[in-house]
Design a protein with these regions (language model features):
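Alpha/propeptide regions of enzymes that mature by internal proteolysis
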Residues: 1-313
Length: 313
């Protein structure tokens, strides 16, 4: 008898307002979300590991210009792309992360390599890239990541003297762009992965929660796997991912109760906006957000696919 397995993904909690979303863009986003969750689910269905499933799912999102990670990463104040990513394996609490990488096509794969092929958890900037090239990752020119849409967003914020956490005429990209995945495999192992380009017009060197284990990413067998998206500074201060795990571990709360207590309670009280995806040891999925929406998809233990954008979908 096949043991339960499931997967959930997100493409960021800062969704484009309904009135600004063209049918063409909506269909493109939904197609990318479906492709990503199916890529991960296929691995689980074949008996593969949760870690490989979440990396495969996130890689699909990194390769799309629709999301703020990899190809679609936003630009820093000095017109560069600087990306963060992390992974965690619930089996042994192994983790790997990178921050401030500029020339790596798929930072999530590099984060996994840091976990599996180094003695460290977090590598940053030039050191992370040196390690990447030693491991066989290809040098990717900044031109690959450049898109007109991201450049226009940067110019808009510059012209108005706004920085990353301010309002802009691109409300979907104010502060929430991140992608992530969580999964439970047939062996009962949990894993989580998160990747981002950060925030538009960020000061060079800024690192958000996506690179920090316990803030943007956490996974622990028998408890939960979490990937977050939102205003990174708040998620770091609140240690959101680990807070969810702690409530489930020590208070014995279910995944729904723990997630909502943090996202709708503590985080919101602090002024933090965003969301998260989580999966418990039984494969129960939960999507929590206090924003207008969150690009998301999941395939539950019954094999049912759901792909959604807005909070009230």
């Amino acid at each position: 008898m096949t043991k339960p397995f499931s997967i959930a993904i997100h493409g960021g909690a800062g969704t484009i307002l309904r009135e600004q979303m063209s049918d063409e863009l909506r269909q493109s986003i939904l197609a990318d979300l479906e492709a990503a969750v199916k890529a991960g689910h296929q691995i689980l269905e074949q008996g593969g590991e949760a870690l490989d499933a979440v990396v495969a799912a996130v890689k699909v999102l990194e390769d799309s210009p629709n999301f703020n990670a990899g190809k679609g990463s936003v630009l820093t104040h000095n017109e560069m792309v600087e990306m963060d990513a992390s992974v965690m394996d619930g089996r042994n609490l192994a983790a790997g992360a990178v921050a401030g990488v500029r020339h790596i096509k798929n930072p999530i794969e590099l984060a996994r390599d840091v976990m599996l092929r180094s003695n460290h958890v977090l590598l940053v900037g030039e050191g992370a890239e040196k390690f990447a090239f030693e491991q066989g990752h290809q040098y990717t020119e900044q031109d690959y990541f450049f898109t007109d849409r991201r450049y226009e967003q940067l110019l808009s914020m510059r012209e108005k003297g706004l920085f990353a956490l301010s309002e802009s005429r691109y409300p979907d990209d104010r502060k929430h762009g991140t992608v992530g995945a969580v999964a439970l495999d047939q062996q009962g192992n949990l894993a989580a992965a998160t990747s981002t380009g950060g925030v538009t017009n960020k000061q060079y060197g800024r690192v958000g929660d996506s690179a920090l284990i316990g803030c943007g990413t956490v996974a622990e067998n028998g408890v939960v796997a979490v990937s977050t998206t939102g205003v990174g500074e708040f998620f770091i201060r609140k240690r959101v991912a680990e807070d969810v795990a702690a409530r489930m571990r020590y208070l014995q709360e279910d995944v729904h109760t723990a997630c909502e207590a943090i996202i709708q309670g503590d985080l919101k009280t602090m002024g933090g906006e965003g969301g998260l995806i989580a999966i418990d040891a039984n494969g129960e999925l939960h999507f929590a957000m206090n924003s207008t929406g969150m690009y998301r998809a999941g395939i539950n233990t019954r094999g049912e696919l759901r792909v959604k954008i807005y909070a009230n979908d």
